[in-house]
């Protein structure tokens, strides 16, 4: 499976363009521009599984750092502050990782 099986390459490119400079990544804006926020819960969880490198069922800080690169391989890494903000936005139970349900809730919030 490729991420472009779910999201259009054009929408992904537009979303990445909006946050190409360090410290400009805004999760909700990215989810809207990429089309992710319009996807069903099932489709969002498919994207989650694609981002979950080690297939642990959770996204940790290292996986979040490379979040944008899962959408396009030559995208930049998230900065430390962007990674922390993304974690804080989704980690509802405070366990230091993001589960599939937490990710889906963040995308659709």
From Swiss-Prot:
InterPro entries assigned: EF-hand-dom_pair, EF_Hand_1_Ca_BS, EF_hand_dom, Parvalbumin
Chain positions with N-acetylserine modification: 2
GO cellular component terms, A-Z: cuticular plate; cytoplasm; extracellular space; protein-containing complex; stereocilium; supramolecular fiber; vesicle
SUPFAM superfamilies: EF-hand (SSF47473)
Tissue: Found in tumor tissues and not detected in normal tissues.
Residue numbers binding Ca(2+) 1: 52, 54, 56, 58, 63
Metal-binding is among the record's keywords: yes
Keywords: Acetylation, Calcium, Metal-binding, Repeat
Residue stretches making up the EF-hand domain: 39-74, 78-109
UniProt record, GO biological process: cochlea development; response to wounding
Binding site for Ca(2+) 2: 91, 93, 95, 97, 102
Single GO molecular function: calcium ion binding
Job description of the protein: Has some calmodulin-like activity with respect to enzyme activation and growth regulation. Binds two calcium ions.
Similarity remark: Belongs to the parvalbumin family.
Listed PANTHER family: ONCOMODULIN-2-RELATED (PTHR11653:SF4), PARVALBUMIN ALPHA (PTHR11653)
This protein's name: Oncomodulin
